[in-house]
Amino acid sequence: NKNGYIVAERGDINRVDKTFSISKTYLSNVVGLAHDKGYIRDVHESVGSYMSTDHFVSDHNSKITWDHLLRQTSHWQGTLWDKPDWADRPPKDIPWTELQTQPLYEPGTFWKYNDVRVNLLALSALHVWRRPLPQILKKYIMPIREMMLKRLILTIH
């Protein structure tokens, strides 16, 4: 609304919408903040050096960096919380029985969206912060978002 006129509309403003991709936005903020604070020294460093689990010990997974996880180019291989990476968004043209034997791409060379790998990024960030990520969001990210929203509202009026 500007000077009493509606300048744009999109969708039903009273309807609740699902926000599927918000986790990637928050995770990139949390990881970026960890880097800014020195908790992550270099985004091109192996994530495995920050973990006390075996998620990054294989020859392939040990090459995966924060940058690879953030860009979804890690091609991490494994199982997280009973869900194997290959079971998430499998290609339609490959039989289910052959999914486990697909070739691995070198980290950083192949992009593929994968919920298991997004969850792995969240687990990795949790290992860095050593406290629940919602606490990090509440303390560091949300106050900035609220300030920006207030500034935007003041600018519009």
List PLM regions with ranges.
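Short, conserved catalytic-motif segment at the N-terminal edge
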Residues: 1-19
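N-terminal core-entry segment
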Residues: 2, 10-11, 63, 71, ...
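Active-site SXXK
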Residues: 4, 18-43, 69, 121-125
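Catalytic-site signature segments of enzymes, centered on catalytic residues
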Residues: 6-10, 80-157
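Acidic/histidine-rich, surface-exposed loop or edge segments in extracytoplasmic proteins
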Residues: 7-11, 31, 49
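A glycine-rich, coil/turn loop motif that links secondary-structure elements
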Residues: 16-21, 56-63, 109-115, 157
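"Short basic amphipathic alpha-helical interaction patches in structured regions
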Residues: 22, 46-48, 83-84
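Active-site helix/loop module of the DD-peptidase/beta-lactamase fold
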Residues: 37-76, 100, 129-157
